[in-house]
A protein has these predicted regions:
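Pyridoxal 5′-phosphate
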Residues: 1-167
Length: 167
C-alpha cells in the first residue's frame, strides 16, 4: 500500500504513513532495545544507552538540553503533560486561550483546569474553518499563561498561522 501508485492518501493531518526508513529504525530499536532502560541488567543498560543517544540527537536538532525533553507514548499523553504541567507550574496568571476545534486531548485537560479555577477563553473558528488570529491575540492579556492552537486541523485540514500567533 505504501508504494501503490494509485493511492492518493490525503489524511496526513490525522495519521501519516510511516516512511520505510523510519519503520526500519523502529523495528531495529524494538528488536535490540526491548528491555526496561531503568533496569540494572545488561539488556536494560543497552536500552538506556540507546534512549540517551536518541534524546541527545533530538536535543541537538531542537537546540535544547537533553534534560528538557520528555518522551511520551503518544500525542494525547504529550498534550496532557504539556498543558497540565505548564499551567500547574506557573506562579502567575490563570488565563488560557484556546481555539474551539482542538483535539480532545487538548480540550479535556483544559476542562480540568477550568474546574480548578483557570480562566479558559475559547475562540471559535471562522466559517471557512480557519482561526482568526486577531481574535486569538485579542483574547490574550497579562494573565494569560498559555495559548493552544493546532497548526493543521486533523479533521478538515485547514492550516492556522501559528507563526504569527507565536510572534
Amino acid at each position: 500500500m505504501l508504494h501503490d501508485p494509485e493511492l492518493h492518501y490525503l489524511d496526513n493531518a490525522a495519521t501519516t504513513i510511516v516512511a520505510p526508513e523510519v519503520a526500519d529504525v523502529i523495528d531495529k530499536a524494538m528488536r535490540e532495545h526491548w528491555a526496561n532502560p531503568s533496569s540494572l541488567y545488561a539488556p536494560g543498560a543497552r536500552s538506556e544507552e540507546a534512549l540517551n543517544a536518541a534524546r541527545a540527537a533530538v536535543a541537538r536538532t531542537l537546540g535544547c538540553k537533553s534534560k528538557e525533553l520528555y518522551f511520551t507514548s503518544c500525542g494525547s499523553e504529550g498534550n496532557n503533560l504539556a498543558l497540565l504541567g505548564a499551567a500547574q507550574t506557573r506562579t502567575f496568571g490563570k488565563g488560557i486561550v484556546v481555539s474551539d476545534f482542538e483535539h480532545p486531548s487538548v480540550q479535556r485537560p483544559l476542562e480540568r483546569l477550568a474546574a480548578q479555577g483557570y480562566n479558559v477563553t475559547v475562540v471559535n473558528p471562522q466559517a471557512d474553518g480557519t482561526l482568526d488570529i486577531n481574535k486569538m491575540l485579542d483574547a490574550v492579556d497579562k494573565n494569560t499563561i498559555l495559548v493552544a492552537c493546532m497548526m493543521v486541523n486533523n479533521e478538515i485540514g485547514t492550516r492556522n498561522d501559528v507563526e504569527r500567533l507565536a510572534a
